[in-house]
Amino acid sequence: MKNLITGVAVSGLLAAVVSGQAAASKTVNGIQVSVAKIERMEKAALKDCPPGTNTVNAVQRPGDELAVVTVNFKVMPDFKPAMFKRPTATAADDKVYNTSVQFVEVGSVPEYSCQFIYRVPTGTKLKAFTVEGTTFDIAALDK
C-alpha cells in the first residue's frame, strides 16, 4: 500500500513537471523547432529571427497585452535554405493572430531562440503556434 501511494505521488509530481516544460520539438523544413514559453509583457523588442539589429519595440495598448512566444531553433544537417513565412498564434476561441517578427536568413546560425510578439486582447489564452504549416500545442504553456 505504501508503494502504491508513493507511486501515485511520484506520478503526480512527474505530470506537474512535464506540464510546465516546453512543447515537444518538431522538425520543420530541416530545422528542429520547440516552443519554450509564453510571457505577457508591456513592451517587447520586435527583433528579426534569428535575432538581428532590428530595434523597433512593440508597446501594449489599453485593452490589449503582448503575448511573447519564445521558440528555440536548431538547424539540422538536412536543412535546405528557404524563406519562412511569419508564424501565427491561435487563441482558445480559434482567432488567429499575426506577428510583426519576420524570419531573416533562417539557417545562418546553428542554434538560436526567437521571441514572436502577438498583440491580443487582455486575458486571451493561446492554444497553438504555427510555423510553415506545422502546429504546436501551447495551451499548457499559457498560464
Regions picked out by a protein language model, each given a short descriptive name:
Residues G7-A16:
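Bacterial N-terminal signal peptides
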Residues G7, G20-K143:
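Conserved functional micro-motifs across diverse proteins
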